[in-house]
């Protein structure tokens, strides 16, 4: 008997062999759920007292860098997610602020007991931006396109054996093997989206499935549609008048490519911007918190910051030394100092919404003396510490505080900032050319741990298994986890997976960085995407 649709919590439903082989194939060095770029929203010029009501129909927002192409089957990064989530929608989504899965373009679904067949009841009356109806056959073609395009998020449909459209409002997906993470793929920020077959057919060049056209246009169902997409300059969105849900207040959204946080701050202070969602240093955030003209909201998502240790070469090829670092570093003080009390050190390896921390707690006893003793005996005490650039000022400060602690332990630490291009090329480098230690994000595409383990720790996975960790027992367990019929059994397998990586001391979790929105007090209606909360639901924003 199929199960009735119910909200699914943290670890509902992974996949054997679905590591992201085509992770960066079609769009440059980008990373899902990752990349962590700033988005700023603005409306009109101001006099220092905040944006005026005369500009309520236009919202202006900078990105810190150009985004990847807005094709939903290629796009796979955080920068630009604001745009793609405003133009495309999936069958399901995460309820804001939670790991619970709720309907979106589907009104409900049933899942067979063997996790092989998913039957979706489709929302009636939904239209694509070209005016055509969204029906089950359109969903079949959308799934087919994601599979054949083979972009970064293509792994999400690699395990689909077939789809069916028994009637216009019923869409059936059958998998090749059980996968209790599949419904999370359909709800995450990089989910398979409804793409208009009419637009694809009209704009295809040969067998490119309209990829060229979709570099500057969209074919979705979202509250906004792309009016302009000018690389290196700006992107303009317009409200879709036939949107099935709540109609947007802002008729136009203009996104400027603005790399400088200092420039963004000047515009925010002068009233030229409505809000900022990420990238400001903690002292600035705290200053805005004390300013009655602004409101501050902090939201935690599903990706944490962590210390990576290079177990493949150099001084940390010694497991005992890695363990001494894990037990000797004061994570609590690093996080508290760098973040000014805005977040705390993670109690477990993964964010709370991904896995209950009490099932696999991190050690709480700190033993710096044991680390000092081991370092004193090392023939070379040089340590290359890299800090991934996309974490902004707080991550940089955490790296500096870590450098200080390691220096006190006797290491000769060199700290450097690592560009994203270098970070995502690490798997192509010999082990000895990788840094000894790195601070970067740690997470997957969903709140389900399968995507984290499979992309960051699976044998041979690239490019996010940065130091090419390999543990056959972990590979076996992550394959076992996705077959479990309920959350309790699945969590027990993931507890064992987590214990393996803790015992091997390859990762040391730091914190879940808060996504901070700084807004003029007359801007309201903030609803964030749950997994990557710097992405706002633009249709909910209002100016009072």
Predicted regions: what they are:
Residues 121, 155-203, 228:
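Surface-exposed binding/hinge segments that line
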């Amino acid at each position: 008997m199929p199960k009735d649709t119910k909200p699914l919590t943290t670890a509902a439903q992974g996949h054997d062999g679905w590591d992201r082989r085509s992770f960066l194939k079609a769009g440059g060095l980008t990373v899902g759920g990752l990349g962590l770029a700033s988005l700023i929203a603005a409306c009109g010029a101001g006099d220092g007292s905040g944006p005026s009501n005369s500009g309520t129909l236009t919202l202006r927002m900078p990105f810190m860098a150009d985004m990847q192409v807005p094709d939903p089957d290629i796009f796979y990064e955080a920068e630009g997610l604001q745009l793609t989530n405003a133009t495309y929608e999936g069958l399901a989504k995460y309820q804001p602020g939670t790991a619970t899965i709720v309907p979106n373009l589907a009104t409900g679904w049933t899942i067979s007991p063997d996790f092989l067949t998913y039957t979706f009841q489709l929302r009636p009356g939904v239209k694509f931006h070209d005016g055509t109806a969204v029906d089950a056959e359109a969903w079949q073609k959308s799934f087919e396109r994601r599979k054949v395009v083979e972009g970064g998020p293509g792994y999400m449909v690699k395990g689909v054996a077939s789809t069916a459209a028994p009637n216009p409002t019923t869409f059936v997906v059958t998998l090749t093997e059980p996968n209790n993470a599949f419904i999370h793929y359909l709800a995450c920020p990089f989910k398979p989206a409804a793409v208009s077959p009419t637009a694809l057919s009209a704009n295809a060049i040969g067998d490119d499935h309209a990829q060229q056209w979709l570099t500057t246009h969209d074919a979705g169902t979202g509250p906004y549609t792309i009016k302009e997409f000018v690389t290196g300059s700006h992107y303009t969105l317009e409200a879709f008048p036939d949107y099935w849900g709540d109609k947007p207040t802002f008729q136009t959204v203009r996104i400027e490519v603005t790399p400088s946080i200092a420039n963004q701050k000047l515009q925010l202070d002068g009233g030229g911007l409505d809000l900022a969602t990420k990238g400001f240093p903690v002292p600035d955030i705290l200053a805005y918190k004390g300013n009655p003209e602004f409101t501050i909201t902090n939201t935690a998502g599903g990706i944490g910051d962590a210390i990576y240790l290079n177990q493949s070469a150099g001084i940390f090829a010694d497991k005992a030394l890695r363990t001494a670092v894990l037990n000797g570093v004061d994570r609590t003080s690093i996080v508290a100092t760098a973040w000014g009390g805005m977040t705390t050190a993670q109690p477990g390896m993964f964010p709370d919404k991904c896995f209950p921390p009490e099932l696999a707690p991190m050690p709480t006893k700190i033993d710096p003396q044991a680390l000092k003793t081991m370092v004193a005996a090392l023939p070379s005490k040089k340590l290359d510490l890299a800090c991934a650039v996309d974490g902004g000022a707080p991550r940089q400060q955490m790296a500096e505080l870590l450098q200080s602690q390691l220096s006190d332990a006797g290491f000769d630490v060199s700290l450097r900032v690592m560009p994203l291009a270098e970070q995502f090329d690490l798997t192509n480098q010999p082990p000895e050319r990788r840094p000894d230690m790195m601070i970067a994000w740690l997470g997957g595409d969903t709140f389900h741990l399968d995507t984290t383990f499979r992309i960051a720790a699976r044998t041979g996975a690239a490019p996010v298994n940065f130091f090419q960790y390999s543990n056959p027992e972990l590979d076996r367990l992550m394959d076992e986890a996705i077959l479990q019929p309920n959350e309790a059994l699945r969590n027990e397998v993931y507890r064992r997976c987590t214990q393996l990586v803790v015992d091997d001391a390859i990762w040391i979790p730091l914190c879940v960085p808060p996504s901070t929105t700084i807004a003029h007090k007359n801007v309201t209606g903030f609803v964030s995407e749950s997994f990557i909360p710097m992405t706002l639901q633009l249709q909910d924003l209002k100016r009072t």
